[in-house]
Amino acid sequence: MEQVPSAGRLVQITVTEGYDLKGFKGDTPVTFIRAEFNQVVLGDSAKITVSPEGSAKYNFTSSFEFNPEGGITSDDLAHKPVFLTVTEVLPKEKKQKEEKTLILGQAVVDLLPLLEGQSSFQTTVPLHPVQGSPLETPRSSAKQCSLEVKVLVAEPLLTTAQISGGNLLKVTLEAAYSVPESFIPTGPGQNYMVGLQVPSLGEKDYPILFKNGTLKLGGEREPVPRPKKWPIANILAPGANNIPDAFIVGGPYEEEEGELNHPEDSEFRNQAECIKKRIIWDLESRCYLDPSAVVSFQKRIADCRLWPVEITRVPLVTIPKGKAGKTEKTDEEAQLSFHGVAYVNMVPLLYPGVKRIRGAFHVYPYLDSVVHEKTKCLLSLFRDIGHHLIHNNKIGGINSLLSKQAVSKNLKEDKPVKEKDIDGRPRPGDVQAPSIKSQSSDTPLEGEPPLSHNPEGQQYVEAGTYIVLEIQLDKALVPKRMPEELARRVKEMIPPRPPLTRRTGGAQKAMSDYHIQIKNISRAILDEYYRMFGKQVAKLESDMDSETLEEQKCQLSYELNCSGKYFAFKEQLKHAVVKIVRDKYLKTTSFESQEELQTFISELYVFLVDQMHVALNQTMPDDVQGTVATIYTSSEQLQLFAFEAEVNENFEMAAAYYKERLVREPQNLDHWLDYGAFCLLTEDNIKAQECFQKALSLNQSHIHSLLLCGVLAVLLENYEQAEIFFEDATCLEPTNVVAWTLLGLYYEIQNNDIRMEMAFHEASKQLQARMLQAQVTKQKSTGVEDTEERGKRESSLGPWGITNGSATAIKVEAPAGPGAALSILDKFLEESSKLQSDSQEPILTTQTWDPSISQKPSNTFIKEIPTKKEASKCQDSSALLHPGLHYGVSQTTTIFMETIHFLMKVKAVQYVHRVLAHELLCPQGGPSCEYYLVLAQTHILKKNFAKAEEYLQQAAQMDYLNPNVWGLKGHLYFLSGNHSEAKACYERTISFVVDASEMHFIFLRLGLIYLEEKEYEKAKKTYMQACKRSPSCLTWLGLGIACYRLEELTEAEDALSEANALNNYNAEVWAYLALVCLKVGRQLEAEQAYKYMIKLKLKDEALLAEIHTLQETVGFGNPSF
């Protein structure tokens, strides 16, 4: 890295002109300018007479030497401005030996641009009047009272590497609120101080001090925005205290990073900031961090996490007569009191892109052991570093090895009001002053409180004292990827799919040509037929029998062959058939075997015959036969059928339904996501990844596609891609709770605790904001809500907080496989349940269900049959292998339960175990009814019914009236073969006022149990409810069976016909149709239904035997008789 030359460089400050000036003795006073920097006078200008217009050309240049190795450093330039004081020289009176001067005003020049790489800059700075100055009343001219200033250095003070690698730290101390009652504004003066240490040059720590806070009584809130002030003493003009363009703007408590940003804290903070006593500083101190200090700062934050910010007060004692007007505390009299500390969590500064944290932080008594345990800090800034920090403006770094004589601390203080802000900034190379503690003994000096007990500091806790602090960096310590970069990376990994172009000369054209040739040939054959048999046809008309027609057919065929027309017709079709082979079947190469050739020819023949019939029907429609209405199944119905097939473990049929949806609408990304979720369920991760990537290629801004691509990338251990997908999702939708949570889980896998905490914190923040907004919306719609309930809800909305212990536990106990993780969760739950049972009894609670806040249940069809489309939208892609429950978000939820809902909805069961571990350890989560339901569902998927039953018992203890619990218990008993218990659970579920989240299979399975137990009336009612909610082949089949057993044959046939229309590949439907037709005596239909049943291979032997028995009874129905 480039090094700054050791020789000092000159910084020149030139005041060229002043505007709108006037004096005490008139509008054309004689004035001069004094330049000061770092409490050193740089020089005085010549005495210039102000023009009648108020301007004065000073052309005054002063300078100081910048030398980072000793003297004025980058840190000095960062937080110390140049003061330009304009003084009027009054005319000499008689017998007056010296000229009398009066100060008119003071201007402040900020040198910060020199640390940003500029070698010169020009600015117009306002001239702030002192009290009583004539400048308080401006002239009538439009120009403001100001000075024109130029700052120049021969070359940039910092190298390119220092500018790019360094940083600027700004610390703003606003106030301490709700201070102890023992703080009173009357009596001896007190210096209220706050301090912290930061690395400034390499590993050396430098203290930042804020002194002389103003104790104020309560009564009104501090105004915002209000200006930030320089941490410099003895500023003459009140307006010069304010840092240009720097303001305290405040903001909502919920957006702060501190400890008092929860909804339940708002009432206390409102009282503290309006009514109670407070100490006001409003100071901003700036510190330049060189590149090595930036690295040290990052490392210190990562290692310590919490930063100690100390607060104390020291009495100000008036110096005896002869030094009137000065208040200063001598070393002998110095005594720290009310020594407290606030622990500031600096970790958010290591979050990508974060440059600022602001918040309120509790003040605790300063105890060495506690401070060291929390922050790893061994020294107290006020007690161990020494009293020179209280008075001196120039102090050496704590770890500095350089030594120079300390500069005298006797500062000019004209009035007590001007003692407000003593600069506490260090200078490299200065010596450490002795500490209060004796250098030769570990025994505290007299008056120093014991290190293990701090009764005065305890008053901060009793009063609820907190400080409001802001820490800001010029550049983020950890850069954040820009959204454009993330979008580019996603585009590189998954190129967007271009829209399909229509080909005019492809398969469609080949089909059209074939149809045209068929029509032409058919007309030619008809012409030949009428030529040969026209008179005979006209004579016989409709009396022609089949033998005559067969004879005419043979004669026509013979004539076509003999005349060569048959050969001509074949040649005419040949070109069209070749185009179909090439464009439709994409066959352009020879076949590898004779068997393959024969198979293809057979397939082609069937296709050509079908298309010939299509063409002939278009040319010669059958006027006698009426048009048959085609039954079209919608995409939503296909999704329901696929769900039923999944639950019944007929994965081949489910895949067929999903693929049919894709064939119909290949550009619909939801269809790709549903098929990908199905592949996740069957653990075909490669196929699932392909589906999700295809969905993302259709819309690269689709959040769910990005998240699912990220989940699959994690499962397939493509971690770099996973980070890109998750980050892009959070950039596209910063309010998405699931996106932030999944990003945090990814960082956990990468052992990046800080970023994990960042993502979880942001997820919790977004969830809290959403729930608060929902509460506001509810209040507006329903009126005033109960105060007690509102308080309970607010207290449960605290942000997710991670502890080191919980993070470690999860990392240790989350192996790669879901099965291993679930076994560990089982053990953990057993231990936690034992502890819980020791402390309290199980509580039976009634789960409140608020539709204004809860999401709609996923698989519940609540509309009538005509509104199938709306009803089907409720399904989304939320099927599980077994009829799982998809829980709506209750009023109080966690970021992890939200993520579990998403993962279960898309069937990413392999990923759920990671989130369950966090939900168990989350302060707002833990073993809840909903948690046990999800855990039971995962065990049902593994067919571990004993564990699932155990967790369902736990869920029932926590919420006995939850319909989801009883519904899942019913499924558990049904799958394990205990149909009597399943029946009881299902009946209890449907008896609740509120439906379970998934009712479709509850009705189906309950109806099946009724059929088994020959309770046909109950089965009929149950299946009718299912048909009304979500009609499918299975619901109509169940209704048809129930009606058949009740001898209601007409209703049975109608229901079975509906079932057949929705799925004509169900052998059981054909079987019952055959039974109905046998009963009503329709032989042809009975034989046809029986034929299809045999073709589809009915597996129910008892039903097959029943059909054979009935066939023998009626004497027909089996073509083999």
UniProtKB/Swiss-Prot annotation:
Compositional bias (Basic and acidic residues): 410-428
Signal peptide: none
Region (Disordered): 410-457, 778-802, 836-858
Record-level GO cellular component terms: axoneme; ciliary basal body; extracellular exosome; motile cilium; outer dynein arm; sperm flagellum
Tissue specificity comment: Expressed in testis.
TPR-type repeats, residues: 635-668, 669-702, 704-736, 929-962, 963-996, 1000-1033, 1035-1066, 1068-1100
Domain of life of the native organism: Eukaryota
Main location as per UniProt: other
A Pfam family of this chain: TPR_8
Keywords, comma-separated and alphabetical: Cell projection, Cilium, Cytoplasm, Cytoskeleton, Disease variant, Flagellum, Repeat, TPR repeat
Single biological process term from Gene Ontology: cilium movement
Localization terms from the record: Cell projection, Cilium, Flagellum; Cytoplasm, Cytoskeleton, Flagellum basal body; Cell projection, Cilium; Cytoplasm, Cytoskeleton, Cilium axoneme
SMART domains in the record: TPR
Annotated disorder: Spermatogenic failure 41: An autosomal recessive infertility disorder characterized by oligozoospermia, severe asthenozoospermia and flagellar abnormalities such as short, absent, coiled, and irregular-caliber flagella. Some sperm show tapered heads and acrosomal abnormalities.
Description of its domains: The conserved TPR domains are dispensable for ciliary targeting. The N-terminal half is important for cilary localization and/or binding to the axoneme.
Function: Axoneme-binding protein that plays a role in the regulation of ciliary motility and cilium length.
Family statement drawn from the similarity comment of this UniProt entry: Belongs to the CFAP70 family.
Official protein name in the record: Cilia- and flagella-associated protein 70
Originating organism: Homo sapiens (Human)
Phylogenetic lineage: Eukaryota, Metazoa, Chordata, Craniata, Vertebrata
